[in-house]
Amino acid sequence: MNEAPTAADRSFFRTLKILIVEDSTEMRRLLTALLESMGVGEILEARDGEKALEIFAAQRPDIIITDGAMQPVDGYEMTRRVRAAGSAEGANPDIPILMISGHVGRENVNHARDEGVTDYLAKPLSASTLYEAIVAAVSKPIHFVDKPGYRGPSPRRKLEPRQPGGDTRT
């Protein structure tokens, strides 16, 4: 972050409930520390997509931040299942889902897009990149209008992995 979060940011972030889905203990700790520094009110954790789906159904997070590669249910499959969840089940299938991955090739980005990921962030992840992605996700949700089952308006945009420090490698 170029600047410290404003009082308004901190006030808003205190209202957020964010679910981290990551099999690496170190990465979960890092993401938790980053989110705490932003003032996020409630941080939930899951080690894989299977546990995340249980937490999603029971706890109703506002945002999901997930890794792509996990077992037994990876971030792609978890995203597909979240998007398929009906509002009749009390779930929000349009929840912002941010995927963090070290795999930034076009095939991975397209796969994430096809499964309904809101934004794709490249590792290593900077605090400013995560902060900007969260603000963008809650300010004006970006989903894919060509994704079957999406119920809300959204601008079309090309999904590109966000690179820390302006790195443009793919």
Predicted ranges, named:
Residues 11, 139-170:
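CheY-like receiver
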Residues 25-44:
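Two-component/phosphorelay signaling modules centered on CheY-like receiver
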Residues 45-54, 75:
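Helix N-cap/capping motif at the beta->alpha junctions
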Residues 59-65:
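Active-site beta3 strand of CheY-like receiver
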Residues 70:
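Receiver (REC) domain active-site loop signature in two-component systems and cognate sites
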